[in-house]
Structures are given as C-alpha cells and as structure tokens.
Swiss-Prot record:
The keyword Ribosomal protein does not apply. This is Putative tyrosine-protein phosphatase OCA1. Keywords: Cytoplasm, Hydrolase, Protein phosphatase, Stress response. Transmembrane segments: none annotated. It comes from Mycosarcoma maydis (Corn smut fungus). It catalyses: O-phospho-L-tyrosyl-[protein] + H2O = L-tyrosyl-[protein] + phosphate. The keyword Cytoplasm applies. SUPFAM superfamilies: (Phosphotyrosine protein) phosphatases II. GO terms for molecular function: phosphatase activity; protein tyrosine phosphatase activity. Putative tyrosine-protein phosphatase required for protection against superoxide stress. Belongs to the protein-tyrosine phosphatase family.
Amino acid sequence: MLVPPPNYGMVEENFYRSGQPDQLNFPFLEKLGLKSVIWLAPEEPEPGFLDFCVDQNIELHHLGVLYSTNAWDPITEEVVLQALHLLVQPATYPVLVMCNLGRHRTGTVVGCFRKLQRWNLSAILEEYRRFVGGQKYRILNEQFIELFDEELVFGASY
C-alpha cells in the first residue's frame, strides 16, 4: 500500500509539497522519481529520510539553516528566493518542497511560486489556508505572500 506523506499535494506536474515523511511514506515517494528535495525547516531532516535521499540519489537542498534555528520564526525572503530560484530551473524537477508539517514555510514558498504564475491573491491564500487547516494560518505569512515582489526572482523585465 502506498501512503503519501502528511500534507502531500501536487503543485504542478513534477512539483510536489508535503510535510516530513517517515519510512511508511518512502515507497510512495519512490514512485515520484524525485530528483530534488527542498527542505525548508531549520533542523536537519530525520536520519531515515536522509538515508532515503542518498539511496534514491535525490539531491537535498537544506535551505532552512540559512535563516533560523527556531521553528517558530517566519521564513525569510532570502530562503524564499533561493527556493524559487531552484524551482524555476528545469534541472531541479521532479521536486518535493517540504518542511516539518508542510504547512507554513512550504505554503509560503508555494504561495510565492503562484505569484510567479500570476495567480490572483485570493486563490493563492485559499490554497495556503487549505493546507494549513482551519484557523491555524499565520497572517504574517499571508502578508509576506501578498507583498512578495516577483521581480526579485527574474528582474525588472518580468
């Protein structure tokens, strides 16, 4: 039986999001044929997941260490930009973007990616809230998404 990781979702073809998987989820992830994982949490992923990435020849980009050691700190613009620069490179795909629960940090990066796709803000925030669940959304993350300047990714010609 294939079991997806918590808060798993397909963002686009070959672009997935989730919370940190455990061993039960590894057979499911194998089917995705991942080339890259973008890990947004400040702490290291679980050792079993690190071993899985090595065994599957998946490149792990640990961006979370760049901004904080506190899991409650909001994601920084620098980390979002680094994640988006990876996400606009075809060589990164298939890719999984994840943090511990696949909610706030992952949702912020996906929300900014949606801005690059020219989604309207209400649709972006609805998707963010759907993965966060209930009233657990963070207004600072929503403001970050709303105010995020897409030109920082591609330059003024965008």
